[in-house]
């Protein structure tokens, strides 16, 4: 099992009790959406559901691809306003396109959907950047649907 942890400083990856911890270095502008929680005698920051989904859409390689993002979006009771805010703050048009497409596909209501659509970048983005270039272009979302 691999656990991904975000930090603003470079930290070497490590394995503890058979669990691999991979540290992702974020710029300060992308380090938001966390709540401080107590774990034993330590305080750690844990990402909100909305931040987790936004980060997954931003970097699908850290969440095992588009299928896991879809599962998370479908199974989660989320705050649509917060998700919209976080997606806008990430400033990643591809991430926004992925979330809007999946939300429409899964009948998940997004707060401020039109604001997100207005933030689509002009080029086509891969639905899943981990996969190849084969697939159908969907102009409504400016996405290459490269998932079978």
PLM region spans:
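Short gly/ser-rich loop at a beta-strand->alpha-helix junction or flexible surface loop bordering the NTP-binding
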Residues: 1-35, 140
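Hydrophobic alpha-helical interaction segments
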Residues: 32-148
């Amino acid at each position: 099992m691999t656990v991904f942890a975000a930090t603003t400083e470079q930290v070497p990856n490590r394995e503890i009790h058979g669990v691999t911890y991979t540290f992702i270095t974020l710029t300060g502008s992308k380090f938001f959406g966390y709540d401080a929680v107590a774990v034993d005698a330590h305080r750690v920051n844990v990402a909100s559901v909305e931040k987790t989904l936004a980060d997954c859409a931003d970097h699908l390689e850290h969440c095992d691809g588009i299928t896991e993002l879809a599962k998370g979006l479908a199974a989660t009771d989320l705050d649509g306003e917060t998700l919209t805010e976080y997606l806008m703050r990430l400033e990643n048009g591809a991430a926004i396109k992925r979330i809007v497409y999946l939300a429409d596909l899964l009948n998940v209501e997004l707060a401020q959907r039109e604001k997100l659509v207005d933030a689509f970048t002009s080029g086509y983005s891969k639905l899943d950047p981990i996969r190849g270039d084969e697939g159908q272009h969907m102009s409504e979302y400016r996405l290459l649907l490269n998932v079978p």
